[in-house]
Amino acid sequence: DVLTSRGLGDVYKRQDSTGRDVFTRVLFGGRVSIFIGLGSAILSAVVGIAVGCYAGYKGGWVDVIALRISEIFMSFPQIILVLLLVSITGQSLFNLMAIFILTGWGGMYRLARARMLSLREEEYVQALRSFGLSTFTICYKHMLPNALSPIMVNITLSTAMFILTEAGLSFLGLGVPLNIPTWGNILNVAQDILVLQNYWWMWGPVGIVISVFVLCVNFIGDGLRDSTDPSQQG
């Protein structure tokens, strides 16, 4: 029996009910889960920064429209909005990433917008305007680098959030298709009470890996915040 043939000392050689090596699936599934989490965080940051920088600098009707759209997305609980969009678009890896980007750009937009609102009154920005530089050059070449510190921290936190969301959706069978190994899909077997009670190696190691990885990502975010925020430095 592939489920009971090995002892505790051979945890890393354990297999699931179909004979697939659990350790290998955790490693390969980690690549997919990290790709989803980090890719979604970076792309949602690109969208949020692009819109937030321009809207925060220019103001006017562009800022009003972008702000209202972001408020619409942020007014719904994210998990409910994700479930609704998954039911409409269907299950696939890239559909899930697109949904994460669509529901996650608002927070980055508001952060970038707030930084631009504070920076656009700085003297160096007034000087750049007097030189006749274009809006694009002022926003994205000169102002954006001064706003990157909180943005980098937010990207790390978004990565952890998207990985946890993917794991939760895949555990419920609503995330990435089950034929693609992800940490959430590996956890999916724990829906069976028999597996949950008797075959801990099929879900326990991946649960620990998810927890440790998310904790490490959050530590990286805390370190970036402490190193870039002068108020956190002694």
Show which residues each predicted segment covers.
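Single conserved hydrophobic/aromatic residue that forms the stacking wall/gate
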Residues: 1-12
